[in-house]
UniProtKB/Swiss-Prot annotation:
Entry PTM: The N-terminus is blocked.
Protein name: Leukocyte elastase inhibitor
Highest classification ranks of the organism: Eukaryota, Metazoa, Chordata, Craniata, Vertebrata
Name of the encoding gene: SERPINB1
Modification N-acetylmethionine, positions: M1
UniProt cross-references to SMART domains, sorted A to Z: SERPIN
Any one GO molecular function term: serine-type endopeptidase inhibitor activity
Amino acid sequence: MEQLSTANTHFAVDLFRALNESDPTGNIFISPLSISSALAMIFLGTRGNTAAQVSKALYFDTVEDIHSRFQSLNADINKPGAPYILKLANRLYGEKTYNFLADFLASTQKMYGAELASVDFQQAPEDARKEINEWVKGQTEGKIPELLVKGMVDNMTKLVLVNAIYFKGNWQEKFMKEATRDAPFRLNKKDTKTVKMMYQKKKFPYNYIEDLKCRVLELPYQGKELSMIILLPDDIEDESTGLEKIEKQLTLEKLREWTKPENLYLAEVNVHLPRFKLEESYDLTSHLARLGVQDLFNRGKADLSGMSGARDLFVSKIIHKSFVDLNEEGTEAAAATAGTIMLAMLMPEENFNADHPFIFFIRHNPSANILFLGRFSSP
Protein backbone atom coordinates (compact mmCIF):
# COMPACT_ATOMS: atom_id res chain seq x y z
CA MET A 1 0.00 0.00 0.00
CA GLU A 2 2.94 2.30 0.59
CA GLN A 3 3.72 2.73 -3.11
CA LEU A 4 0.16 3.85 -3.77
CA SER A 5 0.05 6.26 -0.85
CA THR A 6 3.36 7.80 -2.00
CA ALA A 7 2.03 8.18 -5.55
CA ASN A 8 -1.26 9.67 -4.33
CA THR A 9 0.48 12.11 -1.96
CA HIS A 10 2.92 13.15 -4.69
CA PHE A 11 -0.01 13.93 -6.98
CA ALA A 12 -1.89 15.71 -4.17
CA VAL A 13 1.05 18.07 -3.61
CA ASP A 14 1.49 18.71 -7.35
CA LEU A 15 -2.20 19.46 -7.81
CA PHE A 16 -2.26 21.75 -4.77
CA ARG A 17 0.67 23.68 -6.25
CA ALA A 18 -1.09 23.97 -9.62
CA LEU A 19 -4.27 25.27 -7.96
CA ASN A 20 -2.18 27.68 -5.88
CA GLU A 21 -0.56 29.07 -9.04
CA SER A 22 -4.02 29.84 -10.47
CA ASP A 23 -5.25 31.40 -7.23
CA PRO A 24 -2.49 32.26 -4.72
CA THR A 25 -4.74 33.64 -1.96
CA GLY A 26 -8.17 31.96 -2.15
CA ASN A 27 -9.53 28.96 -0.30
CA ILE A 28 -8.69 25.55 -1.72
CA PHE A 29 -10.42 22.27 -0.94
CA ILE A 30 -10.01 19.06 -2.92
CA SER A 31 -10.09 15.32 -2.45
CA PRO A 32 -6.86 14.14 -4.10
CA LEU A 33 -7.86 10.52 -3.50
CA SER A 34 -11.18 10.98 -5.28
CA ILE A 35 -9.42 12.59 -8.27
CA SER A 36 -6.70 9.90 -8.38
CA SER A 37 -9.37 7.15 -8.28
CA ALA A 38 -11.34 8.74 -11.11
CA LEU A 39 -8.22 9.10 -13.23
CA ALA A 40 -7.16 5.54 -12.43
CA MET A 41 -10.48 4.34 -13.86
CA ILE A 42 -9.84 6.37 -17.02
CA PHE A 43 -6.27 5.01 -17.05
CA LEU A 44 -7.72 1.48 -17.40
CA GLY A 45 -9.00 2.49 -20.84
CA THR A 46 -6.10 4.62 -22.05
CA ARG A 47 -3.43 3.39 -24.43
CA GLY A 48 -0.22 4.73 -26.00
CA ASN A 49 0.86 8.28 -25.30
CA THR A 50 -2.37 9.12 -23.48
CA ALA A 51 -1.70 6.32 -20.99
CA ALA A 52 1.93 7.39 -20.59
CA GLN A 53 0.95 10.98 -19.74
CA VAL A 54 -1.66 9.95 -17.15
CA SER A 55 0.72 7.41 -15.66
CA LYS A 56 3.53 9.94 -15.29
CA ALA A 57 1.45 12.85 -13.93
CA LEU A 58 -0.26 10.65 -11.32
CA TYR A 59 2.89 8.66 -10.52
CA PHE A 60 1.06 5.45 -11.45
CA ASP A 61 4.30 4.33 -13.13
CA THR A 62 5.85 3.99 -9.65
CA VAL A 63 3.21 1.50 -8.45
CA GLU A 64 3.04 -2.19 -9.32
CA ASP A 65 -0.48 -3.55 -9.94
CA ILE A 66 -1.96 -0.08 -9.62
CA HIS A 67 -5.59 -1.17 -10.06
CA SER A 68 -5.53 -4.02 -7.54
CA ARG A 69 -3.93 -1.63 -5.05
CA PHE A 70 -6.75 0.85 -5.54
CA GLN A 71 -9.13 -2.08 -5.06
CA SER A 72 -7.56 -2.90 -1.66
CA LEU A 73 -7.49 0.76 -0.65
CA ASN A 74 -11.17 1.19 -1.51
CA ALA A 75 -12.00 -1.87 0.59
CA ASP A 76 -9.88 -0.53 3.46
CA ILE A 77 -11.52 2.90 3.33
CA ASN A 78 -15.13 1.80 2.85
CA LYS A 79 -14.93 -0.80 5.58
CA PRO A 80 -18.10 -1.36 7.62
CA GLY A 81 -18.19 -0.83 11.36
CA ALA A 82 -15.82 2.15 11.42
CA PRO A 83 -16.56 4.93 13.97
CA TYR A 84 -16.82 7.41 11.09
CA ILE A 85 -18.68 7.52 7.78
CA LEU A 86 -16.37 7.46 4.79
CA LYS A 87 -17.67 6.49 1.38
CA LEU A 88 -15.80 6.48 -1.90
CA ALA A 89 -18.17 5.71 -4.76
CA ASN A 90 -17.55 5.39 -8.50
CA ARG A 91 -19.90 5.15 -11.44
CA LEU A 92 -19.82 5.29 -15.22
CA TYR A 93 -22.61 6.79 -17.29
CA GLY A 94 -22.39 5.70 -20.92
CA GLU A 95 -24.39 6.60 -24.01
CA LYS A 96 -26.73 3.62 -24.47
CA THR A 97 -26.11 3.31 -28.23
CA TYR A 98 -22.33 3.26 -27.80
CA ASN A 99 -20.37 0.01 -27.54
CA PHE A 100 -17.94 -0.10 -24.63
CA LEU A 101 -15.57 -3.07 -24.45
CA ALA A 102 -16.71 -5.82 -22.09
CA ASP A 103 -13.16 -6.10 -20.69
CA PHE A 104 -13.11 -2.44 -19.70
CA LEU A 105 -16.52 -2.65 -18.00
CA ALA A 106 -15.54 -5.83 -16.14
CA SER A 107 -12.31 -4.22 -14.89
CA THR A 108 -13.93 -0.99 -13.66
CA GLN A 109 -16.57 -3.07 -11.88
CA LYS A 110 -14.02 -5.41 -10.29
CA MET A 111 -11.34 -2.87 -9.31
CA TYR A 112 -13.40 0.23 -8.59
CA GLY A 113 -16.89 -1.11 -7.91
CA ALA A 114 -18.08 1.11 -10.75
CA GLU A 115 -21.01 -0.17 -12.72
CA LEU A 116 -22.02 1.24 -16.08
CA ALA A 117 -25.39 2.97 -16.14
CA SER A 118 -26.72 3.29 -19.70
CA VAL A 119 -28.29 6.68 -20.34
CA ASP A 120 -29.69 8.48 -23.36
CA PHE A 121 -27.27 11.37 -23.87
CA GLN A 122 -28.19 11.46 -27.56
CA GLN A 123 -31.93 12.09 -27.23
CA ALA A 124 -32.28 13.27 -23.61
CA PRO A 125 -29.03 14.81 -22.30
CA GLU A 126 -30.85 16.91 -19.70
CA ASP A 127 -32.51 13.84 -18.16
CA ALA A 128 -29.13 12.09 -18.07
CA ARG A 129 -27.55 15.09 -16.33
CA LYS A 130 -30.29 15.08 -13.68
CA GLU A 131 -29.89 11.34 -13.13
CA ILE A 132 -26.13 11.74 -12.59
CA ASN A 133 -26.67 14.64 -10.18
CA GLU A 134 -29.25 12.65 -8.20
CA TRP A 135 -26.82 9.77 -7.76
CA VAL A 136 -24.02 12.07 -6.56
CA LYS A 137 -26.45 13.87 -4.23
CA GLY A 138 -27.39 10.51 -2.68
CA GLN A 139 -23.77 9.40 -2.30
CA THR A 140 -22.78 12.67 -0.57
CA GLU A 141 -25.79 12.85 1.76
CA GLY A 142 -27.15 15.84 -0.16
CA LYS A 143 -23.99 17.93 0.26
CA ILE A 144 -23.19 18.03 -3.47
CA PRO A 145 -26.62 18.48 -5.07
CA GLU A 146 -25.48 19.56 -8.53
CA LEU A 147 -22.18 18.18 -9.73
CA LEU A 148 -23.00 18.91 -13.37
CA VAL A 149 -24.54 22.28 -14.18
CA LYS A 150 -26.88 22.78 -17.13
CA GLY A 151 -25.13 22.45 -20.47
CA MET A 152 -22.29 20.33 -19.15
CA VAL A 153 -23.49 17.26 -21.03
CA ASP A 154 -25.04 17.33 -24.49
CA ASN A 155 -26.10 14.96 -27.26
CA MET A 156 -22.46 14.38 -28.22
CA THR A 157 -21.54 13.11 -24.74
CA LYS A 158 -20.53 9.44 -24.74
CA LEU A 159 -19.24 8.83 -21.23
CA VAL A 160 -19.34 10.59 -17.88
CA LEU A 161 -17.21 9.12 -15.17
CA VAL A 162 -18.22 10.09 -11.66
CA ASN A 163 -16.37 9.69 -8.40
CA ALA A 164 -17.84 10.91 -5.14
CA ILE A 165 -16.33 10.87 -1.68
CA TYR A 166 -18.15 11.65 1.55
CA PHE A 167 -16.77 11.85 5.06
CA LYS A 168 -18.32 12.55 8.40
CA GLY A 169 -16.33 12.04 11.57
CA ASN A 170 -16.44 13.21 15.16
CA TRP A 171 -13.35 14.48 16.94
CA GLN A 172 -11.74 12.16 19.45
CA GLU A 173 -11.74 15.28 21.66
CA LYS A 174 -14.72 17.51 20.94
CA PHE A 175 -14.71 21.27 21.30
CA MET A 176 -17.24 22.53 23.85
CA LYS A 177 -19.86 24.66 22.08
CA GLU A 178 -20.00 27.12 24.98
CA ALA A 179 -16.31 27.93 24.49
CA THR A 180 -16.88 29.16 20.91
CA ARG A 181 -16.59 32.94 20.54
CA ASP A 182 -16.64 35.56 17.80
CA ALA A 183 -13.03 36.42 17.02
CA PRO A 184 -11.11 38.24 14.29
CA PHE A 185 -9.45 36.13 11.59
CA ARG A 186 -6.59 37.89 9.81
CA LEU A 187 -6.67 37.39 6.05
CA ASN A 188 -3.35 39.20 5.52
CA LYS A 189 -1.39 41.97 7.24
CA LYS A 190 -4.24 44.47 7.03
CA ASP A 191 -7.64 42.80 6.57
CA THR A 192 -9.67 40.81 9.09
CA LYS A 193 -13.02 39.03 9.12
CA THR A 194 -15.00 37.74 12.08
CA VAL A 195 -15.20 33.98 12.62
CA LYS A 196 -16.71 31.65 15.20
CA MET A 197 -13.52 30.58 16.98
CA MET A 198 -13.69 27.22 18.77
CA TYR A 199 -11.44 26.48 21.74
CA GLN A 200 -10.19 23.52 23.75
CA LYS A 201 -7.14 22.58 25.78
CA LYS A 202 -6.19 18.92 25.51
CA LYS A 203 -3.26 16.62 24.74
CA PHE A 204 -2.56 16.40 21.01
CA PRO A 205 0.32 15.32 18.76
CA TYR A 206 2.19 18.55 17.99
CA ASN A 207 5.41 19.80 16.45
CA TYR A 208 7.17 23.08 15.80
CA ILE A 209 9.27 23.42 12.65
CA GLU A 210 12.01 25.94 13.35
CA ASP A 211 13.16 26.79 9.83
CA LEU A 212 9.57 27.27 8.64
CA LYS A 213 8.38 29.07 11.78
CA CYS A 214 5.35 26.82 11.58
CA ARG A 215 3.27 24.77 14.02
CA VAL A 216 1.90 21.33 13.18
CA LEU A 217 -1.13 19.97 15.02
CA GLU A 218 -2.85 16.62 14.63
CA LEU A 219 -6.52 16.40 15.64
CA PRO A 220 -7.57 12.72 15.60
CA TYR A 221 -11.11 11.62 14.81
CA GLN A 222 -12.86 8.97 16.89
CA GLY A 223 -11.09 5.66 16.47
CA LYS A 224 -7.88 7.48 15.46
CA GLU A 225 -7.81 5.91 11.98
CA LEU A 226 -8.38 9.36 10.51
CA SER A 227 -6.84 12.67 11.54
CA MET A 228 -6.91 16.28 10.48
CA ILE A 229 -3.43 17.77 10.33
CA ILE A 230 -2.98 21.54 10.30
CA LEU A 231 0.09 23.55 9.28
CA LEU A 232 -0.05 27.02 10.82
CA PRO A 233 2.66 29.67 10.34
CA ASP A 234 3.59 31.66 13.48
CA ASP A 235 2.45 34.87 11.86
CA ILE A 236 1.73 36.57 8.55
CA GLU A 237 5.21 37.63 7.47
CA ASP A 238 4.73 37.94 3.70
CA GLU A 239 2.52 40.37 1.78
CA SER A 240 0.01 37.62 1.06
CA THR A 241 -1.65 35.01 3.32
CA GLY A 242 1.45 34.17 5.39
CA LEU A 243 1.64 30.75 3.73
CA GLU A 244 4.09 31.60 0.93
CA LYS A 245 7.14 30.10 2.65
CA ILE A 246 5.38 26.80 3.38
CA GLU A 247 3.83 26.63 -0.10
CA LYS A 248 7.20 27.26 -1.80
CA GLN A 249 8.77 24.39 0.15
CA LEU A 250 5.83 22.02 -0.17
CA THR A 251 7.02 18.72 -1.65
CA LEU A 252 6.10 15.11 -0.99
CA GLU A 253 9.25 14.59 1.11
CA LYS A 254 8.81 17.77 3.14
CA LEU A 255 5.12 17.18 3.82
CA ARG A 256 5.88 13.68 5.09
CA GLU A 257 8.80 14.90 7.18
CA TRP A 258 6.74 17.68 8.80
CA THR A 259 3.69 15.58 9.60
CA LYS A 260 4.67 11.94 10.13
CA PRO A 261 3.56 10.60 13.53
CA GLU A 262 7.10 9.89 14.76
CA ASN A 263 8.01 13.57 14.31
CA LEU A 264 5.14 14.78 16.50
CA TYR A 265 5.11 14.67 20.28
CA LEU A 266 2.23 14.72 22.71
CA ALA A 267 1.70 18.19 24.17
CA GLU A 268 -0.97 19.99 26.12
CA VAL A 269 -2.24 22.40 23.46
CA ASN A 270 -4.46 25.46 23.69
CA VAL A 271 -6.29 25.06 20.38
CA HIS A 272 -8.15 27.94 18.78
CA LEU A 273 -9.67 26.83 15.47
CA PRO A 274 -12.34 28.55 13.36
CA ARG A 275 -15.58 26.81 12.59
CA PHE A 276 -15.89 26.80 8.81
CA LYS A 277 -17.63 25.49 5.74
CA LEU A 278 -16.03 25.40 2.32
CA GLU A 279 -17.66 24.46 -0.97
CA GLU A 280 -15.40 24.50 -3.99
CA SER A 281 -15.85 23.58 -7.62
CA TYR A 282 -13.10 22.95 -10.15
CA ASP A 283 -12.76 22.09 -13.79
CA LEU A 284 -9.44 20.31 -13.43
CA THR A 285 -8.73 20.09 -17.17
CA SER A 286 -6.25 22.98 -17.33
CA HIS A 287 -4.58 22.06 -14.03
CA LEU A 288 -4.06 18.46 -15.16
CA ALA A 289 -2.77 19.71 -18.52
CA ARG A 290 -0.21 21.77 -16.58
CA LEU A 291 0.88 18.53 -14.88
CA GLY A 292 1.35 16.86 -18.27
CA VAL A 293 -2.05 15.23 -18.95
CA GLN A 294 -2.79 16.76 -22.36
CA ASP A 295 -3.73 14.20 -25.00
CA LEU A 296 -6.63 12.90 -22.89
CA PHE A 297 -8.53 16.17 -23.47
CA ASN A 298 -7.64 16.50 -27.15
CA ARG A 299 -10.21 15.14 -29.61
CA GLY A 300 -7.53 14.37 -32.20
CA LYS A 301 -4.93 12.84 -29.90
CA ALA A 302 -6.79 11.02 -27.11
CA ASP A 303 -6.33 7.26 -27.18
CA LEU A 304 -9.08 5.64 -25.12
CA SER A 305 -9.17 2.58 -27.34
CA GLY A 306 -9.07 0.39 -24.22
CA MET A 307 -12.65 1.52 -23.56
CA SER A 308 -14.17 1.06 -26.98
CA GLY A 309 -11.69 -0.32 -29.48
CA ALA A 310 -12.19 2.86 -31.55
CA ARG A 311 -10.32 6.17 -31.38
CA ASP A 312 -13.37 8.45 -31.17
CA LEU A 313 -13.49 9.08 -27.42
CA PHE A 314 -11.84 11.89 -25.47
CA VAL A 315 -12.42 13.44 -22.05
CA SER A 316 -14.05 16.85 -22.37
CA LYS A 317 -13.96 17.87 -18.71
CA ILE A 318 -12.98 16.61 -15.30
CA ILE A 319 -15.25 18.31 -12.80
CA HIS A 320 -14.49 18.12 -9.10
CA LYS A 321 -16.77 19.52 -6.40
CA SER A 322 -15.97 19.34 -2.74
CA PHE A 323 -17.59 20.28 0.53
CA VAL A 324 -16.28 20.46 4.08
CA ASP A 325 -18.04 21.49 7.27
CA LEU A 326 -15.83 21.70 10.33
CA ASN A 327 -17.42 22.34 13.73
CA GLU A 328 -17.21 21.54 17.44
CA GLU A 329 -18.44 17.95 17.00
CA GLY A 330 -16.13 17.11 14.12
CA THR A 331 -16.01 17.32 10.38
CA GLU A 332 -18.34 16.58 7.53
CA ALA A 333 -16.65 16.51 4.17
CA ALA A 334 -17.63 15.40 0.74
CA ALA A 335 -16.03 15.61 -2.66
CA ALA A 336 -17.40 13.91 -3.18
CA THR A 337 -0.13 5.43 16.43
CA ALA A 338 -0.05 4.72 19.93
CA GLY A 339 0.74 7.89 21.85
CA THR A 340 3.30 7.65 24.60
CA ILE A 341 1.89 8.57 27.96
CA MET A 342 4.02 11.14 29.73
CA LEU A 343 3.77 12.45 33.24
CA ALA A 344 1.52 15.49 33.29
CA MET A 345 4.12 17.70 34.90
CA LEU A 346 6.60 17.01 32.10
CA MET A 347 4.17 17.86 29.39
CA PRO A 348 4.96 21.05 27.53
CA GLU A 349 2.09 23.45 27.00
CA GLU A 350 1.73 24.90 23.53
CA ASN A 351 -0.49 27.51 21.93
CA PHE A 352 -2.08 26.90 18.56
CA ASN A 353 -4.13 29.91 17.55
CA ALA A 354 -5.45 29.52 13.99
CA ASP A 355 -6.55 33.14 13.60
CA HIS A 356 -4.81 33.47 10.21
CA PRO A 357 -4.56 31.30 7.06
CA PHE A 358 -3.49 27.66 7.36
CA ILE A 359 -3.14 24.48 5.29
CA PHE A 360 -5.01 21.38 6.44
CA PHE A 361 -5.53 17.81 5.31
CA ILE A 362 -7.46 14.75 6.41
CA ARG A 363 -5.35 11.60 6.41
CA HIS A 364 -6.31 7.93 6.48
CA ASN A 365 -3.64 6.89 8.99
CA PRO A 366 -3.40 3.12 8.29
CA SER A 367 -2.59 3.73 4.61
CA ALA A 368 -1.17 7.29 4.99
CA ASN A 369 -3.41 8.47 2.13
CA ILE A 370 -4.55 12.08 1.99
CA LEU A 371 -8.33 12.01 1.59
CA PHE A 372 -8.84 15.77 1.57
CA LEU A 373 -6.44 18.69 1.26
CA GLY A 374 -7.17 22.36 1.65
CA ARG A 375 -6.14 25.88 2.44
CA PHE A 376 -8.34 28.03 4.63
CA SER A 377 -7.50 31.64 3.91
CA SER A 378 -10.82 33.44 4.17
CA PRO A 379 -14.10 32.74 5.94
